[in-house]
């Protein structure tokens, strides 16, 4: 009896201590970093020159880390390519790389910097985390030697990886992730042989990490949420904005809502390549975001998040739409191009009404009312159901309400940043063949609309109030991962299309 009581006491004590040491909320920070680039050269520089460039960027990151820590942040995310920039060859990136060990080695570089060779960048990041008692997420390059015993070993005898690292508040390396889905011009890096699903636990939730282009694919992004059940995604990125559907703050906030997870996105700040857009996103609404194409300055964002976001019911994305009768009100369909994909459109000719447009298996239904019907602005409802083959190969189903660039219907789908028409209400749904649908609402001047819309359990994206600003787009962006072509295999249409239409911007650049 005494032993049983003692065990019960110990169990209760352990539960109380564990609850006391865990946090219901935490303060997240992301830093949009105005990266300092090395001199443009394809010739490898000396290790000393490479370290000098990296230290200049680390000086700026140090200021952001220190400021975030003083404001109570528990974790800070910094961007992809934030320490050395971009536009490298396989040879010219090499002086910037370090050997990054498996975190299972239990290593604090600040205390033991030479344990794995010359690792000055890891040492500095570790000391920054330790000195400021904060988790730091950074993106650097990893190098791993190989030989002929490995049939996949590159000719130069090494693997080079685009790598995210995480140091905890004591400076310990707790996570290392090698980017799986490399973008077209990331020839300086290798993809890992298998997707890495990287997680770590803290007193303020379970975290997963992936990088930039990974967000468009199932592995490891969806796996982290669906199978590993992380609370928060860490997302270093070097994202080039492409409207109307792939601006950074628009798509990243939509992914957080669609996957029902916290999402910390840190982008490079480099307006010359349309790189801007960072945010702290909760499943229900953005907590903080930044988009700035006008200045050349970085930006630190902080916001409070729930450590364990409240679970929400799974959305049946086709439930409502499958029971709606088509409403075309006599309008004629026309086609338009969005990022090389041919959409089927209907012009919204009235101040309000109900419209339906279909393509293949996808029918999109819209109910709406504008605040006024302007003669100088045209809006359209569009549908796309097909395989996207430019700068990656991935299957999409998209329903979108968008503003056309001009009153010429041929401009529907072109990039637009400003509008004048507000909407009193909207409700958008579609007969999606996937559970992976990401809801986007983007307002004039590239602004989000936190708290102004919601997704119902039956798959409707609808407004809660009149929009606070003019509307650029209201979109349901669906991904059918099972219909993707083979990984890392791009259609010949990619090169052909880029040659035929060189004015079209890539959505992500290295």
From Swiss-Prot:
Residues 1-22 form the signal peptide. It holds the Pfam family Vanin_C. Residues 31-307 form the CN hydrolase domain. It is a lipid-anchor; GPI-anchor. GO terms for biological process: pantothenate metabolic process. GO terms for cellular component: plasma membrane; side of membrane. It catalyses: (R)-pantetheine + H2O = cysteamine + (R)-pantothenate. It is found in: Cell membrane. SUPFAM superfamilies: Carbon-nitrogen hydrolase. The active site is at residues 80, 179, 212. InterPro entries: Biotinidase-like_euk, Biotinidase/VNN, C-N_Hydrolase, C-N_Hydrolase_sf, Vanin_C. Glycans are attached at residues 39, 87, 147, 201, 316, 354, 504. Amidohydrolase that hydrolyzes specifically one of the carboamide linkages in D-pantetheine thus recycling pantothenic acid (vitamin B5) and releasing cysteamine. Belongs to the carbon-nitrogen hydrolase superfamily. BTD/VNN family. This is Pantetheinase. The lineage of its organism: Eukaryota, Metazoa, Chordata, Craniata, Vertebrata. The gene is VNN1.
């Amino acid at each position: 009896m005494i032993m049983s009581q003692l065990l019960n006491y110990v169990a209760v004590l352990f539960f109380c201590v564990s609850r006391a040491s865990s946090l219901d909320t935490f303060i997240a920070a992301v830093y949009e970093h105005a990266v300092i680039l090395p001199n443009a050269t394809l010739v490898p520089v000396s290790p000393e020159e490479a370290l000098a460039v990296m230290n200049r960027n680390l000086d700026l990151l140090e200021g952001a880390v220190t400021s975030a820590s003083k404001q109570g942040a528990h974790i800070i995310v910094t961007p992809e390519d934030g320490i050395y920039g971009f536009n490298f060859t396989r040879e010219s990136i090499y002086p910037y790389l370090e050997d990054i060990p498996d975190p299972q080695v239990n290593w604090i570089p600040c205390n033991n910097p030479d344990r794995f060779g010359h690792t000055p960048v890891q040492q500095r990041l570790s000391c920054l985390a330790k000195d400021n008692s904060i988790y730091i997420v950074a993106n650097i390059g990893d190098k791993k030697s190989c030989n002929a015993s490995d049939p996949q070993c590159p000719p130069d005898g090494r693997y080079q990886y685009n790598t995210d690292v995480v140091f905890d508040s004591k400076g310990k390396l707790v996570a290392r992730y090698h980017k799986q889905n490399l973008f077209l011009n990331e020839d300086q890096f290798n993809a890992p042989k298998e997707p890495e699903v990287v997680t770590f636990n803290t007193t303020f939730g379970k975290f997963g990490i992936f990088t930039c282009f990974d967000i468009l694919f199932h592995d490891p992004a969806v796996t982290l949420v669906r199978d590993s059940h992380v609370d928060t995604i860490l997302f270093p990125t070097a994202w080039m904005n492409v409207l109307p559907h792939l601006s950074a703050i628009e798509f990243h906030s939509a992914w957080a809502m669609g996957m029902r997870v916290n999402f910390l996105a840190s982008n490079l700040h480099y307006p010359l390549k349309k790189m801007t857009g960072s945010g702290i996103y909760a499943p229900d609404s953005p907590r903080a975001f930044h988009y700035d194409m006008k200045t050349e300055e970085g930006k630190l964002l902080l916001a409070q998040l729930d450590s364990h976001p409240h679970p929400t019911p799974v959305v049946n994305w086709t439930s409502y739409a499958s029971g709606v009768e088509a409403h075309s009100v006599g309008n004629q369909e026309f086609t338009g191009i969005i990022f090389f994909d041919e959409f089927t459109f209907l012009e919204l000719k009235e101040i309000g009404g109900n419209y339906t447009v279909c393509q293949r298996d996808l029918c999109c239904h819209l109910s709406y009312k504008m605040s006024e019907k302007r003669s100088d602005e045209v809006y359209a409802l569009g549908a796309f159901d097909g395989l996207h083959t430019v700068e990656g190969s991935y299957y999409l189903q998209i329903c979108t309400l968008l503003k056309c660039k001009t009153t010429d219907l041929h401009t529907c789908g072109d990039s637009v940043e400003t509008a004048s028409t507000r909407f009193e209400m909207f409700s958008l749904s579609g007969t999606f063949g996937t559970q992976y649908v990401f809801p986007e609402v983007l307002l004039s001047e590239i602004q989000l609309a936190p708290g102004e819309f919601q997704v119902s359990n039956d798959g409707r994206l609808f407004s809660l109030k009149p929009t606070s600003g003019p509307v650029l787009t209201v979109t349901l962006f669906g991904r059918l991962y099972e219909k993707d072509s083979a990984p890392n295999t791009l259609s010949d249409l990619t090169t052909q299309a880029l040659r035929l239409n060189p004015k079209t911007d890539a959505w992500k650049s290295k």
